[in-house]
Amino acid sequence: MADWQPDVLGDDYEQLTLPLAPDEEGEVVATLVRRRRPGPDPYLDVLYVHGWSDYFFQTELADFWEAHGARFHALDLRKYGRSLRPGQTPGFVADLATYDEDIEAALVAMGHRGDGRSPREVALMGHSTGGLPLRLWLGRAPGRAAALVLNSPWLEFQTREVGRLLLEPVIGARARLKPTRPRPKVDLGGYTRSVSKEFGGEWSYDLAWRPQHGFRTTPAWLSAVFHGQQTVARGLGIGAPVLVLLSARSTLLPRWSPEMMRTDTAIDVAGVAQRSVQLGDLVPVARLPGARPGGGRGGRG
């Protein structure tokens, strides 16, 4: 394994490249990011995983967790952000279980090998689509994490279960015939406008790693997401407490609306709230007025 190197976030952060098994597109890596100088005697390790067409840049998350005595790490999954290599299809996997390797590699680098020898417990945190592989991995690795925090998790399709089940055969057929054929863009610009500092949002980030309209999805990737959402729908508990954070409302429109500065523009929060209670035995769901996907609070329009 390589050594920790300076990170694009500046002198306060460093990154570690995690080599993974190559695939048909060549070399595959994931990337772990952390502060260079952690706080004294952390009692908990936190591993954060981003969502679709995203990467870690929200240093406020590290500030929050480390101010509360935790050691924060963020993982750029394969083919995203720091882990995206030339010639790769951004974000592409055909099975969300593929991310088990990324998660395991990150935990091993953090000192969590699953042998009970780590001096600290670990909590997992996922945003949007990033919550799905974490939840699925934890179902296959019970007891490995003390808690799971999901921020605007994409646990159900925007058309809810009925629409997803109708689309599944069509998407599945396309996934078998042309798995990497780009689909139409899913973000027409409203999401970016609500979070980017350039348009009045809170954050500045690299548009090469998080394009204005997002990377194009593929049939195989969407089929994998549908399969993961169906696994959640079956109600398989994960044996750890789960906190789900959602906006109070969604604004799912093809055109810009000032309401997008105060609501979730990516998921159907009502449908996800209903699905969330099937994650386990202890699942508090917080519906936060004015919250946008990614953790921002609105009020500006």
Q: Residue locations for each model-derived region?
A:
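Alpha/beta-hydrolase fold nucleophile elbow
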Residues: 113-128
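Short beta-to-alpha linker loops that shape the active-site pocket of alpha/beta-hydrolase fold enzymes
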Residues: 52, 76-81, 154, 289-292
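Serine-hydrolase catalytic core
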Residues: 182-282
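Catalytic active-site module of serine/aspartate enzymes centered on a nucleophile-bearing elbow/loop
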Residues: 280-301
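Alpha/beta-hydrolase-fold enzymes
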Residues: 129, 133-216
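Short, surface-exposed "cap/lid" segments of acyl-processing enzymes
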Residues: 34-77, 84-86
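Alpha/beta-hydrolase active-site loop
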Residues: 92-113
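N-terminal cap/lid segment of alpha/beta-hydrolase-fold proteins
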Residues: 1-39
